[in-house]
Each structure stands twice: as structure tokens, then as C-alpha cells.
Amino acid sequence: LNVVKYALTIEFIFGTILAWHFYSALDMGLTGIAWGYWHAISAFCNAGFDLFGDYASLTGHYNDITLNLCIMALITIGGIGFTVLDDLRRNRKWKKLRLHSKIVLTASAILTFGGTLVILALEYTNPATLGGMPNELDKWMAAAFQAVTCRTAGFNTIDLTDMRASSLFFMVLLMGIGASPTSTGGGMKTTTVLVLLVSTWGLLHGKRDTVLFDRRIASETVDKAYNVFTVCLLWMLGAYFLLLICDGGLHRADYVLFEVVSAFATVGLGVGITPDWNDWGKLILVLTMYAGRIGVLTFVLSFLHSKDDKIRYPSENIMIG
């Protein structure tokens, strides 16, 4: 019930703001009211479906402050997860928040602000994207929007086909990380990646425990994070390889990779090449979306029968790396 309450309240508040904006500022009349609530729900649920048509998304409104801020806020709120929202409601002070909430909020802040700076740096001199915008505010807002929308939202205010290859690859990394657990988004999840990074950093410095915010992460949780990362990576690489075969060299390899990761993280961003693939290619994308949405471990294990190992074998060390 709390999940439904949070979702309806957030969607109603931002939907009302957007409905009034579409109705008055964009002069769309009564149609704008429906459009406002549609886009609010679509953004909060990280769906990315828009009503502008022609695969334009929000590219015609990159300088609309109200629309951009509302959509970014909805994507972010929907992407941090209902568990964190409930924790924030109960505990207003940082010290009282659960470890999970601290990790999610920290990772989200790093991805948003760091992603904004990287995209701004990569696209600042590109005349087809940020370089062609009239003022600094528009450039910063567009860079921030692309960083946020990679959290599995699917909206865009820049034509992705005009972006540089380095920017698309960086967006692939952001999409692969995705949103947070119990959220409306997909991907490997922010907690998985942050735990992996901290664990790896600790191992490089000779530390056996993974510690975050003065709390030790259970070894079982760290192992699960490694398993999730490995299976997700293998799935995306496998889908990428198969789609390269289906594509037959028709499109750029980085475009194919972009579509695969976007599908796995259920982002919805695209560079317009999906309609060109045959039924096998589209089936691979569909399966990839299912695996990414319900969790690749859950998806794979649903086809396997787990058996308890009743035999415990002797251990032996091997050389790694």
C-alpha cells in the first residue's frame, strides 16, 4: 500500500505541474492536461514513452526549464527505489538512514553530477549537440538531462545520433549501472556496482572486509554482487555478439552495443537501428529486456534446477591474474 501511495502522490503532484505547463506555457489546451499526466507517469516509472512522435522525444524542448527539471526529478525519484523513499520519510537525518539508503543516494549523486560533467566535457564543442546551443544554462541542463535519463528513463533532449562515439560509450556505462533495487528502473543496480568498487579497492589495499559508512558489508552480499555483475556482463556480451551477427555489418558496432545495453537496462533510448533487424534480432532484444527487468539471475535460474552439493571437496589454491 505504501508503494501505491508513494507512486500516486508523486505522479499526481508532478503531473499537475506538467499538465499546467503543457496547458498554459506550451499552449496545448485540454490536450496538454492529459499529456502532462502521461509524461509524469512515464518518467516516474522510467518508461520513457513520449507523445511527440517521429522519435523526437524531448529534443524540441531542451531549453524548457520546467519540463526538464520535472522529468529529471521524476526519473531520479523513481530510480532510487521505494525502500529509500520510505526510509527518507521516516528518517530525515543522514545518520539515521539505513546503510542501503546511504549507498543508493551516494551512488545516485555521483552518477548524476559526475555524468553531467563528463557529457558536458565530451559534447561541449560538438556543434550538432551542446556546441550549437545558445547559452551556458541550456548546455548544462542538456548534459544533466542525458546523465539522468541513462538511469533507465528513455527520454532524451539531444539527438543521440549526433553525439560523439565517446559520449555514447559513456552513456552505455551509465545505462549498464542503471537504477537502484526496488525501483522502477533496470540495469545492474547502483548498489551492486558501488559494493564491487569498494570491495576491489579494499582488496588492492590488503583489506579483507568491505566497509561503507562505518558498516561492514556481509561477505555473502559481496559475493552476490560479483555474481550479478558477472552474469549481467556475460548476458550483454552474448547478446551483443548475436546481434552483430544479425546486423551483418549494416550499422556501426557501437550503435549495436548501445541498443543491447539500453534493452538490458530497460532504458528505452535508441539510435534508430532496431527496426532494421530481422525477427531473430528483435527476439534477442526482447529476451534481453526481460532478463534485465526481472533480474538476470532470477531469469536464468528459472530455467535451471538447483541441487544441493552433498559432497565437499578438498580445496587447493591456483594462480589468478
For each of these PLM feature ranges, what is it?
Residues L1-G321:
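Membrane-proximal intracellular helices of multi-pass ion channels
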